């Protein structure tokens, strides 16, 4: 096993790209993974359960993973992601806030709703996913 043996990692935006590669690497190093991905394309269109594909790949490599489809843009979504980890593994050791969206427009052409969507995922999403983890760390005295 690797340096993350039996650690539990939540990785948001893990259905594609950097998040997926991080999930695969962590799994190879022995971590149990919560693969979170809403399943939308970076521009917000579509909805596929791509997290299932990453979970299947991790399991094919001998790892352990579960999928989660909640959006990081709401506090409830962040709590549900954390709950998925606790329900599946009983602990959380690592949170990687990787989820992101793209509104490929210049500021001149951007609507306020585009800006709000980006901030909800890229900024508030970090808070929504990290706060339950930080509270858990403090409440379980895992600061060391």
Roles of regions detected by a PLM:
Residues 2-34:
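Canonical Rossmann dinucleotide-binding motif of NAD(H)/NADP(H)-dependent dehydrogenases/reductases
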Residues 29-53:
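Conserved glycine-rich Rossmann-like NAD(P)H-binding loop of the short-chain dehydrogenase/reductase
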Residues 130-131:
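A short, exposed helix-loop element centered on a Lys and neighboring polar residues
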Residues 58, 106-107, 114-116:
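Substrate-binding pocket helix/loop in short-chain dehydrogenase/reductase
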Residues 61-64, 84-97, 103:
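A glycine-rich helix->loop->beta "capping" turn
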Residues 48, 69-80, 112:
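The beta1-alpha1 cofactor-binding region of Rossmann-like NAD(H)/NADP(H)-dependent oxidoreductases
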Residues 56-75:
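Rossmann-fold cofactor-recognition segment
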């Amino acid at each position: 096993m690797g340096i993350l043996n039996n650690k539990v990692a939540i990785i948001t935006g893990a259905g594609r790209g950097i998040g997926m590669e991080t999930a695969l690497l962590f799994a190879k190093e022995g971590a149990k993974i919560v693969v979170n991905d809403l399943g939308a394309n970076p521009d917000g269109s579509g909805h596929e359960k791509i997290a299932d594909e990453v979970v299947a790949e991790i399991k094919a490599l001998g790892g352990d993973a579960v999928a989660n489809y909640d959006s990081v843009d709401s506090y409830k979504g962040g709590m549900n992601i954390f709950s998925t980890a606790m329900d599946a593994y009983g602990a959380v050791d690592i949170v990687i806030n990787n989820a992101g969206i793209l509104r490929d427009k210049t500021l001149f052409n951007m609507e306020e709703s585009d800006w709000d969507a980006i901030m909800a995922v890229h900024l508030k999403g970090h808070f929504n996913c990290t706060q339950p983890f930080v509270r858990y760390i403090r409440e379980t005295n895992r600061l060391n």
